[in-house]
C-alpha cells in the first residue's frame, strides 16, 4: 500500500522505467511487497522553487513502515541519479496514514 507521487519540472523520457525502478526502491525501503506499491509521475510540471531550475517534489504515503530519516537520502540520491536534479532542489513529504483511512479491494485495512 505504499504510494509515491513524483512531480517534477524536468522532462522524463522513459516514465515506465522510472516508475518501475522507484517502485522497487520504495518496496525495499518500506519492506512491503512491490505488488502493493503504487507510483505516479507528473513530469514537465510548472514548479517554481526560487527560480526555474529543474526541481522535484515527492509525496510518499504508507500505513506504517516509513522512516523518513533513513529513507530521505536513498530517495533523493535516486532522483538525482535518474533525473539529474540537484539534491538541494528535491523536497520529500512523508505521511503515515492510519489503516482505517486507507482502502483497497473495497474495504479499509483497519
What do the predicted segments below correspond to?
Residues 1-110:
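Interaction-mediating elements
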